Amino acid sequence: MGLARALRRLSGALDSGDSRAGDEEEAGPGLCRNGWAPAPVQSPVGRRRGRFVKKDGHCNVRFVNLGGQGARYLSDLFTTCVDVRWRWMCLLFSCSFLASWLLFGLAFWLIASLHGDLAAPPPPAPCFSHVASFLAAFLFALETQTSIGYGVRSVTEECPAAVAAVVLQCIAGCVLDAFVVGAVMAKMAKPKKRNETLVFSENAVVALRDHRLCLMWRVGNLRRSHLVEAHVRAQLLQPRVTPEGEYIPLDHQDVDVGFDGGTDRIFLVSPITIVHEIDSASPLYELGRAELARADFELVVILEGMVEATAMTTQCRSSYLPGELLWGHRFEPVLFQRGSQYEVDYRHFHRTYEVPGTPVCSAKELDERAEQASHSLKSSFPGSLTAFCYENELALSCCQEEDEDDETEEGNGVETEDGAASPRVLTPTLALTLPP
């Protein structure tokens, strides 16, 4: 079996080496692992890149070749005990109690043996009463540490070493009990299971909101208890090659979800849609629908907050691949008013509907088109809007001056054929200078 496994590993290593060599030949002369980065950055066609963070929040990372891992874990024993699984924790604590009883049982047996309590004719004043074998010494250690006190075995005043051993075992037993109880309570109060009632939508959507392309996903809290100081974060992970030729397998880029405006802090009583505006600072600024389908990245979303019952911080994670970003979709409403109350229907939590007329181009192209349209609109006017208003105001003032002159002439009167002075009828005219 060992030889077959070794052969399989060797063949796998050779195959991987051949594939890497073939990739380097296709890419041409480039930088290799000893300082040169591979030329291709995008994943091969037809190959799906594995998730860095799974949908349930677990990180798809495995640590290998760690030097001194056991010593590092033992140096932080309490955290190690809290992080391990329950079965290993119970096994560790059972072995700890058993080792403690065996250790002090051996100490009691040695004290009794050195005093001569195990001899055929027992001494008149033994160190321990009714302790004549190792099994009896083990039972005495168990009864002492657990405070069972059956009333048969006991320590006498004959041996000070025996009294000191009993005192030492009581202290060690208290310390061990405190450690075990603290670790168990910390593990039980760990807010890890709170994440089971915090959910993310299965897909994220890209649609227009307030005339801007936005990336949106939904979060919800299934419990009636609130998540205190809840806030969201997001990061985009993708491979990148720097201008210096350094290849970064997973480059972390922050995705703005309203940190500056405070919209990243949410009141998670009902499901909320998190919005990322795709602007010039967004890593998705140059991606349209077609480019998004061919992109190679992973969007990691994080929800953090304090559990209301324990005030302990919890973190819920999920991720979205490009295939899980639905372009031109919106989420169905989940909050409805029923009488004097609001009702949340989680049947619609993951559902989306298509929005006709959503542009398929990138946000950058939309901004360029809007800028071109504004330039063409401005070029159609010979002057600015201020100049246009000023010309109309000037024409209106001139018209008012003409009216005043006419009123003066009207006061003097104009003679008619019969010699009577008749008033002059004036028709004011507003001269507006309109742009061509």
Swiss-Prot record:
Modified residues (S-nitrosocysteine): C81
Topology within the bilayer: Multi-pass membrane protein
Tissues of expression: Expressed preferentially in retina.
Record-level GO BP terms: potassium ion import across plasma membrane; regulation of monoatomic ion transmembrane transport
Main location: membrane
Stretches for region Disordered: 14-43, 400-436
Disulfide bonds: none
Keywords: Ion channel, Ion transport, Membrane, Potassium, Potassium transport, S-nitrosylation, Transmembrane, Transmembrane helix, Transport, Voltage-gated channel
Intervals of motif Selectivity filter: 147-152
Cytoplasmic-facing ranges: 1-83, 188-436
Compositional bias annotation for Low complexity: 426-436
Start-end of Acidic residues biased regions: 400-418
SUPFAM superfamilies from the UniProt entry: E set domains (SSF81296), Voltage-gated potassium channels (SSF81324)
GO terms assigned for molecular function: inward rectifier potassium channel activity
Catalyses which reaction(s): K(+)(in) = K(+)(out)
Activity regulation details: Channel activity is regulated by variations of cytosolic pH; channels are activated by alkaline and inhibited by acidic pH values. Inhibited by Ba(2+) and Cs(+) in a voltage-dependent manner; sensitivity to those inhibitors is lower than in other Kir channels.
Similarity comment text for this entry: Belongs to the inward rectifier-type potassium channel (TC 1.A.2.1) family. KCNJ14 subfamily.
Name assigned to this protein: ATP-sensitive inward rectifier potassium channel 14
The species this protein was found in: Homo sapiens
